[in-house]
Amino acid sequence: MNTVRVTFLLVFVLAVSLGQADEDGNRMEKRQKKTEAENLLLPKLEELDAKLWEEDSVESRNSRQKRCNGKDVPCDPDPAKNRRCCSGLECLKPYLHGIWYQDYYCYVEKSGR
């Protein structure tokens, strides 16, 4: 009976020690595979990112105007600021209405000037 216990204990200790060694080996393999996958994926992601930024930066002639003010809306005559009038409108000082609130408003461009 003692020999069976000793044999069982010996087999159990060997199985546990070899099993842990396999787990460490599996962890190392997983870590290596992960780094290899990251190294393969990184150039593809950088290329995709560059293409997306390139598409955003290129404006086509059909692209719509960004954030502009409509007719009779307060504006700023300084073109560097964001409060500019849409195409077909110009930023002028108001004649009667709006003189109490803002200095300039967007009006339709006069073609006779």
From Swiss-Prot:
GO molecular function per UniProt: sodium channel inhibitor activity; toxin activity
Cysteine pairs bridged by disulfides in the record: C68-C86, C75-C91, C85-C106
Swiss-Prot/TrEMBL keywords: Cleavage on pair of basic residues, Disulfide bond, Ion channel impairing toxin, Knottin, Secreted, Signal, Toxin
Coiled coil (UniProt feature): none
Expression (tissue specificity): Expressed by the venom gland.
One cellular-component annotation, GO: extracellular region
Signal peptide location: 1-21
Propeptide intervals in chain numbering: 22-67
InterPro entries: Toxin_22
Compartments where found: Secreted
Predominant location: secreted
Keyword set includes rRNA-binding: no
Top-rank lineage group of the source organism: Eukaryota
Function statement: Probable ion channel inhibitor.
Family listed: Belongs to the neurotoxin 14 (magi-1) family. 02 (HWTX-XVIc) subfamily.
Domain notes per entry: The presence of a 'disulfide through disulfide knot' structurally defines this protein as a knottin.
Protein name: U10-theraphotoxin-Hs2a
UniProt source species: Cyriopagopus schmidti (Chinese bird spider)
